[in-house]
């Protein structure tokens, strides 16, 4: 296996919103999708592999439209790198994975969080770190990393009762 030159092939993180980027803006408001936390999480983790952020959307995944998914697919396909992470809300992550499956010759890993990254007990840091590692070693295709597991994008579902992703 040939190791690519990191400087020539940085990892691109495309952000779409979702719980990973949610915040309370004041004590009276509901969660809202805020500025992406991906850059902060990678800096705190002292990630040295080259990466860059493409902030595409700031939406709850339940609010994503078919047009948003086409825009996501086109944005991911247009990246000059072979490795792309997509931060995404967990409720419709598998729907976006299906749309991204039409992209050939890229390793695409979707991840998100069940609790906002701004919360100390969030799974966001772990999930993003796992996606960052997975995107470097997996062959081209679409994957989802959640709950300490890597799933093929076409062989996973969110079990809302258990609050986790499961094969299927």
List each model region and its residues.
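Active-site histidine-anchored catalytic micro-motif
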Residues: 2-168
């Amino acid at each position: 296996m040939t190791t690519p030159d990191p400087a020539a092939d940085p990892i691109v993180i495309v952000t779409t919103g979702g719980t990973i980027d949610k915040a309370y803006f004041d004590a009276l408001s509901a969660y809202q999708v805020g500025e992406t936390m991906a850059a902060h999480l990678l800096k705190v983790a002292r990630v040295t592999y080259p990466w860059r952020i493409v902030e595409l959307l700031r939406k709850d995944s339940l609010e994503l439209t078919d047009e948003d998914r086409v825009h996501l697919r086109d944005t991911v396909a247009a990246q000059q790198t072979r490795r792309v992470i997509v931060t995404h809300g967990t409720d419709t992550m598998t729907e976006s994975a299906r749309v991204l499956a039409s992209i050939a010759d890229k390793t695409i890993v979707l991840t998100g969080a069940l609790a906002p990254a701004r919360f100390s007990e969030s799974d966001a840091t772990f999930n993003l770190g796992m996606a960052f590692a997975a995107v470097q070693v997996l062959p081209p295709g679409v994957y989802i990393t959640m709950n300490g597991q890597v799933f093929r994008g076409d062989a996973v579902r969110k079990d809302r009762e258990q609050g986790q992703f499961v094969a299927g």
